[in-house]
């Protein structure tokens, strides 16, 4: 990006873009335990703590911890159980993420962490925040790996994780994850499209074309469908 800016007409725009990248880039830190038996790398970003995974790992006062406890208690009482409370905040988190409301999405998944810090969906959701909001593929992958080990993973977990590995240009790592993803969600067209990409990038054209054939029958999303047409041409599938 720096090279492009040196020769760019719009130098002010490039300078601003570089500033945004610098602000978004995570600060390096140590490993922190964020649930019993669960440790992650402490990564923070230049945005309000509520917009960051795990509230930016901020040290909370006794009063703030008490407010968290009150929130969790009230939510459980309102919904009827801890499981239902988790389901409520998670649904709001995914809805906000799908609408591009990243601050709200982060807040909801952070609230899910307060409600049930051991659950897989907490790390799945915050991995999506790390990837989409901050472009931090390393942290996203770390959280996806945690999510794989925690209770009650969503069926979409491996599909989302495999996609991140593809975006990170790691098709060899992505393929086994995506092979499992299409077993978990055999009707999810996008997972088949991503698997086809991984197979093709790993040199297995025939297997890639086989995945293309399945993907075409599963109605992938519009963006994935465009990728599918391009991939089919590149792989010269029949």
Short names for language-model regions:
Residues 2-15:
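Bacterial N-terminal signal peptides that target proteins for export
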Residues 12-24:
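Bacterial N-terminal signal peptides
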Residues 32-51, 66-68, 201-238:
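Terminal, low-structured helical/coil segments at or just beyond the last alpha-helical repeat
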Residues 98, 132-133, 167, 201, ...:
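Register position in tetratricopeptide repeats
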Residues 114, 118-186, 190:
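Alpha-helical adaptor scaffolds
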Residues 125-126, 160, 194, 227-231:
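Canonical tetratricopeptide repeat
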